[in-house]
Amino acid sequence: MVDHSAALFNKAQNYMPGGVNSPVRAFGAVGGVPRFIKKASGPYLIDVDEKKYIDYVGSWGPMILGHAHPAVIQAAQEAVQNGLSFGAPCENEIKLAALIGEFMPSIEKVRMVNSGTEATMSALRLARGVTGRSKIIKFEGCYHGHADCLLVNAGSGALTFGMPSSPGVPLGTVQDTLTATFNDLDSVAALFEKYSKDIAAIIVEPIAGNMNLIPAAPDFLTGLRELCNQYGSLLIFDEVITGFRVAKGGAQSLYNIRPDLTALGKIIGGGMPVGAYGGRREIMNQLSPEGPVYQAGTLSGNPVAMAAGLATLKELTAENFYSNLKEKTERLVMGILSRAKAAKIPLTANFSCGIFGLIFTSEERVTRYAQAVNGNVEHFRSFFHKMLDNGVYLAPSAFESGFISAAHTNKEVDNTLDIIENIFSVSETYLRISV
């Protein structure tokens, strides 16, 4: 049988760095050849060799309704008929902004952009402009896009300036980025004690989705809110992943914490390129043209993206939408854990509504970045390829979250569990815990 994905990947490497337009897609973390997809429908992907996969990537989070949802496709098609881009305001921008604010009351005003990276980058610029301060606090293992000031690894301790984690990022660009330990409030308090008058904002994922999946402890987020109140800094929630996925009001509604600013993306575009950031009215009013903080974008508020996003968010109001999604997520994750336990496979998991993370480790709970990176990457790599060979598409990295959509039914979940049970039953002995 001809492997068309392999042929396309070889060809792609002649024209694109690594053959892809986003690094993780190249399968570098797991090895092998990335599948080239030609079609997606509901909970399934179909590759160029006509192989069908149950999809637990969901375009890295946006496809909460599943692929090619009829209402979203119809809205996008109708919008396309009227033009692809105007460079001028359109009515759906207002409708989408209003619905975002209705779902997430902390967002009193919102600015549309084109990606999650733009959203976090612009939110930080706004925070610095409003406070007149330069330093920000981020957390090791939290990914906020590829803006220079956010491409920072943790130092050897909490009280360190950031060091660039990519060539091409000047040291001076990240000298105002301070790194603390996720779920460790003391590390944040120590930074405030040393740099209190200089810290403009804390930016944090309330549920971290790029060091596998690690939810923040409730008292950790409460403590961040209190520290920001105490020192006059802004609290920014990066809900690019969690916004409208873990709950209609995002993770902030689950934790009952009101951030000053929120970054959004993924779901609000229904699969189209989009991002947004918003928050308190008096802060957002500092944005140009109303205020002095400048931010702009040629394609911001794109009419097709606005139509797709609006159609998606409307579907989230369906009765029992989130309770059903949470139930399916729990059915999948608990089913995986029970099968791992029966086969003596060292595996743990974290999950929230519509999102999950699997870590090959004997630790019962993973709550810190250091634990996540100590998971057995080789075990994941083996598991990933066995799942792929059996028609289940997982994220090709041990440190990425998985996603489940409203289009997944118990049929897909149970098929996945049957495949996993079979894989675990015949796995190499190195996947087993000694008893």
UniProtKB/Swiss-Prot annotation:
Gene Ontology molecular function, alphabetical: glutamate-1-semialdehyde 2,1-aminomutase activity; pyridoxal phosphate binding; transaminase activity
Cofactor or coenzyme needed: pyridoxal 5'-phosphate
UniProt xrefs under SUPFAM superfamilies: PLP-dependent transferases
Record flagged with keyword Transport: no
Pfam families the UniProt entry points to: Aminotran_3
Modified residues (N6-(pyridoxal phosphate)lysine): K266
Keyword Amino-acid biosynthesis part of the UniProt annotation: no
InterPro entries listed in its UniProt record: 4pyrrol_synth_GluAld_NH2Trfase (IPR004639), Aminotrans_3 (IPR005814), Aminotrans_3_PPA_site (IPR049704), PyrdxlP-dep_Trfase (IPR015424), PyrdxlP-dep_Trfase_major (IPR015421), PyrdxlP-dep_Trfase_small (IPR015422)
Alphabetical list of PROSITE patterns matching this protein: AA_TRANSFER_CLASS_3
Main location: cytoplasm
GO cellular component, one term: cytoplasm
Localisation per UniProt entry: Cytoplasm
Domain of life: Bacteria
Single biological process term from Gene Ontology: protoporphyrinogen IX biosynthetic process
Gene3D superfamilies: Aspartate Aminotransferase, domain 1 (3.90.1150.10), Type I PLP-dependent aspartate aminotransferase-like (Major domain) (3.40.640.10)
Enzyme Commission number(s): 5.4.3.8
Pathway: Porphyrin-containing compound metabolism; protoporphyrin-IX biosynthesis; 5-aminolevulinate from L-glutamyl-tRNA(Glu): step 2/2
Reaction(s) catalysed by this chain's protein: (S)-4-amino-5-oxopentanoate = 5-aminolevulinate
Quaternary structure annotation from Swiss-Prot or TrEMBL: Homodimer.
Family the entry assigns: Belongs to the class-III pyridoxal-phosphate-dependent aminotransferase family. HemL subfamily.
Name of this protein: Glutamate-1-semialdehyde 2,1-aminomutase
Phylogenetic lineage: Bacteria, Pseudomonadati, Pseudomonadota, Gammaproteobacteria, Legionellales
Gene that encodes the chain: hemL
